[in-house]
């Protein structure tokens, strides 16, 4: 989206909010507040604001409202109830085609989930088409395992797609359209050094390569396939006076001599992202592109390409940044940590990858609900584990079976226990259909070390004991006696049937403990509530159960 288009939207919203008259100062303030990357282009933005305000204020109120609907904009009054769900897509004409286009540098992380889920939600809403496009045209940033990990992660997220496209299979297409672009005079082969071109670009001047004819540029293009890396690039002609130097004659093709994991050394001239993306979006019929507002400049670059080739661009929808507090998302940092042995793998609980989140028992529905709630608003949003845990807890509370788990357990023989005690507790307090579990207390019991304290204790649903000098002495059985004693409630595990268990925490530390014997029926991927400890997913079963901790 070009600056003029973005500013026009802000002016339109301001006008509708203030009886049809937009205020230049208010519009400028909104743009600078919500689009920090444009602050360094303030003079250009100010001119665009003035033009947009004049245009918007010349419209009748009903025309302004019509424009709002066309662009999919809405005004939220502070006192109004917050709108539920995603807003409608703007400019829907016929079939809606969207794409999710990750780089295969590793598995997906929770930041990718936003784009994947939002595209899927819109595809379902409009009964449209969703394309999974693997953008692997930088051989040095391709992890071969990612070709399998990405679809697997999407399946866990519940994202369904209609077609898979792998860009490295389409190299001949990119070559064809590079030639077309050169023939139309929209691109040229540049042999300037990066330093030399940077000087030309910063001064807003053309290098000598720009003025060469089509025939010579086509010859240079063919020669690029034999030239060494760094000796030549293809540049798309834009505006050399553009306020943003990054947009001036951007690179569309470059030479890369690295071996590609899928195609080997078959190709050595590769497209840059902005070129391959624009070509594919057009040829695949993509109608709407959802992307972060950090791609505003990329959208503007691609629009030059569309104009050169006589194509209609898709509708670009830019949303605000998603700030992720306390969540490790760097793919390169994670890979480095895995190689160094800091992390056990891509599903290490300290990471923010989809597979790490799934391993901890976070439900995909919780992630989907969060991303839909954040939506495509242009303002930045913040996400944290606390928010994810809250949504996930609402899901797990309804389905997780309950068990006693004693962390760092201490074994006791209860002195004076009059006889075996049989306790029957429901697997879920609100779902009797799940059945009960049986705890047989015959004298020996495990208690969690961290909950021990001198004085009266109530073994939940069982007996009252006195803990003193490292020993447990039976006192009584009734709950009324426990109240009179002001006994502290404590969960417990019968020693005779106890199973060894370990809980892997979010920081990858491990807590050893024991769990009640009925947990032997648990299977891998079951998520349970370890009462008074937290929710956890079964990672492995057998004589020693391994859980991955989710949250309280």
From Swiss-Prot:
GO molecular function annotations of the record: ATP binding; glutamate-tRNA ligase activity
Localisation per UniProt entry: Cytoplasm
Keywords, in A-Z order: Aminoacyl-tRNA synthetase, ATP-binding, Cytoplasm, Ligase, Nucleotide-binding, Protein biosynthesis
Renumbered ranges of motif 'HIGH' region: 102-112
Enzyme Commission number: 6.1.1.17
Catalytic activity reported: tRNA(Glu) + L-glutamate + ATP = L-glutamyl-tRNA(Glu) + AMP + diphosphate
Record-linked Gene3D superfamilies: 2.40.240.100, HUPs, Ribosomal Protein L25, Chain P
Main subcellular localisation: cytoplasm
GO BP, sorted A to Z: amide biosynthetic process; glutamyl-tRNA aminoacylation
Record's GO cellular component terms: cytosol; protein-containing complex
Family: Belongs to the class-I aminoacyl-tRNA synthetase family. Glutamate--tRNA ligase type 2 subfamily.
Function as written in the Swiss-Prot or TrEMBL entry: Catalyzes the attachment of glutamate to tRNA(Glu) in a two-step reaction: glutamate is first activated by ATP to form Glu-AMP and then transferred to the acceptor end of tRNA(Glu).
Protein name: Glutamate--tRNA ligase
Species in which this protein is naturally found: Methanothermobacter marburgensis (strain ATCC BAA-927 / DSM 2133 / JCM 14651 / NBRC 100331 / OCM 82 / Marburg)
